[in-house]
Each structure stands twice: as C-alpha cells, then as structure tokens.
Amino acid sequence: MKTFLHSSKDKQSLSNWSLRQKAGFFVFLALFAICIGMACFFNGFSLPNLLILIAIAIVSMVIYVLPISLHPVVKAVITIILPTAAFFLLESMTHVVWETMEIDAVLLNLVFYYLFFLFFFFVSGSTKISLDILLIFTMIVGLANYFVILFRSSPILPWDLLSVGTAATVANNYTFSITYLVAQLTAGFLGCIILAGKCNIHFPALSAKKTIRGLIRLALCCVLIIPSAFYVHFYISLTLRIIQALTTRCLLQNICLRQMAFSLPF
C-alpha cells in the first residue's frame, strides 16, 4: 500500500550529495541567516517574531535535507496551492489582502499567477522549474515593491521599469530596512521554493516523438499568451484611467480654488 510520505528509494547521505545539492543547501542556509540577521539588526530583539522566523527556516531546511518522496496526489495538491501562496506572500508584504482588496481583484490576480505558472510549465515541462521562476520572480517583485512604498508611499507601476537606472543612482541616499513580517514572508518564499523541489511533476509524454510534444507545448503557450495579454492590457488601462481621473479631479479642485480666490471681496 502506498503512503503519502515515504523515504526515497535512492536515499543518499549528505556526503553523497551532488555539488548542486550542496551548493543549494548552503545558499538557502545563508539566505535564511541573512533574513534573521537583518530582522534583528533593524528591529531589535523580539522573541515571538524571532521564533517564528527561526521555525520557518528550520522546517524549510529539514524538508531540504530529508530524502523524502511525496505521493503524486500530494505533489499535485502542493503544486496547485503554491501559486496562491506566492500571491498572498507578495501582497502581505505591504498590506492585509482581505482588508484592502476586493474578492474580484484577488481572483483576477490569481488568474494571472496561474497563467504565469502554466506558461513556464508548458515551456519547461517541469513544475519545479515553473514554480521556481514564479516564486523567485514574485519574491523579488514583492521586496522591490516594499522598498518603493517605503521610500515614496506608492507601489511599483509598469512605467517604473523605464527609470531603473535613475533609481539605482539615488539608492545610496536611502536606508534599506525590513520588518520582522517582511523577513518572515521572505523566508516563506524560500520555504516554498524548497517545497517545490520536492513535488516536481514532469509533463506527460503525449507522443513518442519529441517534435510533436514540442509543438503541443508551443500551442499551449500561445493559448496562454492571449489571456495574459488581455490581463496586462486591462491592468495598464485601468491604472491609466485612475491616474487620469485623479489628475482631472486635482485640476478641477485647483480651478475652483482659483475662482474662489478671485471672487473674494477685498
């Protein structure tokens, strides 16, 4: 009888790890240490927050070290959950999702996350590669968005990509600091990346010929590009309409104030 969690048949000791496994172990260990160190340095000693951060790091590293093999059903469930986890980890860096976002906005964002995941899954044929790309990308965007809001009190906008060079030149004028929450969420991203490596699902062999499999993957990618393009177009158009509305409102208020000033008797 199959169990949902059991030891891998090709169990290896730590000394028999490949160079990539050893490098990954020390990279993750260093990243967790950086999260803990920066959180303590910028916020002082807080035992409850520190224990949560250490617990996330320990559980993640234990998952990395243990030679476990998950049941295919468990792999599928975790794979389905991780894009949603990436969304909530990213958004929680700057606000409480359910207090600041409507349910339709949450669902629309989740659709984009799953399209992102499926696109790279069909390209690579591996859920591990696709989830790694999604999680690393969202972690970087989340941290960048956190620092942008910290400095100018507004989130990252699409046209901010055009001013990356300017931002890099003035970065030395700001102090980069993180809260315990941001450190915990970053550690959560790292834990999700480790977990994704334990539940890799390969693209099924749809044909004996690689050419046909490649064409099918390409067709699926093209199908996913269409809704993704509509999503990006909708997001940018909505942002532009909001900015235009705010600008028009400010101009109208300015005109009204000027008219009131001219009409005041002296």
Across the structure, where does each feature detected by a protein language model lie?
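Short extracytoplasmic/periplasmic juxtamembrane "stem" segments immediately C-terminal to an N-terminal membrane anchor
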Residues: 243-260
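Cytosolic juxtamembrane regulatory segments of multi-pass membrane proteins
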Residues: 169-176, 255-263
